[in-house]
Regions:
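Surface-exposed, glycine-biased beta-strand/turn segments
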Residues: 2-79, 86-91, 105-108, 112-115, ...
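A solvent-exposed, charged loop/short amphipathic helix patch at secondary-structure junctions
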Residues: 96-107
């Protein structure tokens, strides 16, 4: 089936994967579009890019995802979204700060084309946080269909993190 041929995405965190939220849960005003990885009650864990691609969107807001990075993976036909971030990697942060000064505003929503901010599988793109509308430190992660924008169940791409005999 198509399900069996899905790519395995790189682990976003180098800590044992524990979920605090699942895909499709009914929240107060929306369906949960991704999965939430617990971060041991702390912020500041390195977040690793799931696959080769490019940063396609950066969000900074006092609510919602707070700080978020969207990475487009053209070869996989996917977009991965990393939310509630404490901070961005230096190459991403430089762009964010310049834009905040230019616009004289904290809130930004910037989109980028392929080639502008390339990222590699496993590259550190941010630090985990508790920003935006977050009830405690965690990493929110979406996997979306590049063509339709539909939210996909991330567990289909991260099964290997949960059902293996590797313990760290």
């Amino acid at each position: 089936s198509a399900q069996e041929n899905l790519p395995e995405l790189h682990r976003p965190l180098n800590i044992p994967p524990v979920l605090s939220g699942n895909f499709g849960e009914l929240r107060s005003n929306h369906f949960h579009s991704g999965i939430d990885f617990k971060t041991q009650g702390r912020t500041g864990f390195k977040i690793h890019c799931a696959a080769d691609g490019y940063v396609s969107r950066i969000l900074v807001s006092p609510w919602g995802f707070g700080r978020a990075v969207y990475v487009t993976h053209p070869q996989l036909g996917l977009v991965t979204v990393y939310g509630h971030l404490e901070s961005f990697s230096s190459k991403i942060n430089k762009i964010v700060v310049e834009e905040q000064y230019r616009r004289e505003t904290f809130r930004i929503d910037m989109e980028f084309k392929e080639g502008e901010i390339p990222v590699k599988k496993g590259e550190v793109i941010a630090l985990s946080g508790n920003a935006g509308s977050s009830g405690g430190p965690h990493l929110h992660m979406d996997v979306r269909d590049l063509a339709t924008g539909d939210a996909l169940d991330p567990m289909n791409y991260f099964k290997h993190l949960f059902f293996s005999f590797e313990f760290y």
